[in-house]
Amino acid sequence: MALITRRDFMQKTTTAVAAGILLSGEMLRANPLGLPIGCQTWPVRDMIAKDFPGTLKTLAQAGFQSIELCSPVGYADSGFAGLAKYQPAELQRILSDAGVTCISSHFGIEELRANQDASIAWASSIGLKQMIVPSLGGPKNPTMDDVKRAADEYNRMGEKAAKAGIQQGLHNEDFELSTVDGKRTYDVLFGLLDPKLVKFQFQVSTISEGYDAADYFTRYPGRFFSMHVQGWSAKTRKIVPVGQGTLNWQKIFTTAKTGGVKNYFVEMALPMMQASVPYLRKLQVS
């Protein structure tokens, strides 16, 4: 079965799941890693396009304390163009009024190629500390030279971001899930990308293609700073709320500490994100 990408699994998980409960202030912090429960805003992009402040309040009421945005330039056609109308202070006020924080956002690789300086300027102006691309955008069947060129380019981008006090990051979708010379391109990239300039953000749903989060966190200690969280049922091969399905979340979060994960973002259809909060709030890891 093909990898369930962000766009794919959002289309597959729109059936109703019990809505999340409103949580009191003291219940909003997740026990796993002692971090706030975060969510990616991609699943609620249509809501954001209509009402950004209201959407953030909905997420906060569901129990999310932090969010990860998508760039208004690289994701302009996906509902985020409207973010550009806000002055930095106004956007920060909207976040504060909703009761959520934001230090991370996704950016398109083409956006960075076209004008990384402008992207860094926007990120810095709203207080971001992490800039992540979903994929390096290489060919489906790359040669080793293709992979090396992509890594060299992204190392340079990481160096430029670092000068602005921002950590560049790489998600794992599409190109990263290809193979090159009989090896996983993703694994090859760990050897080519500078550990100081580029950190990794793991997409847990890539278990559908055999990419195990706990395995990667263990094999590449300190190379990660984030993860996107989805539940997964091996029986139905479908995305499910966190805590349901077949994933061992204690193992994932325990090894995430080894991997270096500093934040995580639930990313599924809104009802599933809401339904994931109670489990994450109660989950204990050693």
What do the predicted segments below correspond to?
Residues A49-F52, A81-A84, P88, K140-V147, ...:
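Flexible, glycine- and charge-enriched loops at secondary-structure boundaries
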Residues G74-G79, P139-M144, A234-I239:
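A short acidic, helix-capping loop that chelates divalent metal ions and anchors anionic groups
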Residues G38-K50, S104-R113:
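Active-site mouth loops of central-metabolism enzymes
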Residues A2-G38, R45-Q65, S124, V180-K199, ...:
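Histidine-acidic metal/acid-base catalytic patches
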Residues W42, P72, E110, L136, ...:
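Flexible loop residues that form catalytic
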Residues T13-T15, A19-G20, V73, I94-K199, ...:
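Active-site acidic/histidine proton-transfer and metal-coordination neighborhood
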Residues C39, L69, S105, V133, ...:
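Conserved beta-strand positions
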Residues E68-E90:
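Glycine-rich, proline-tolerant flexible connector loops at the mouths of alpha/beta enzymes
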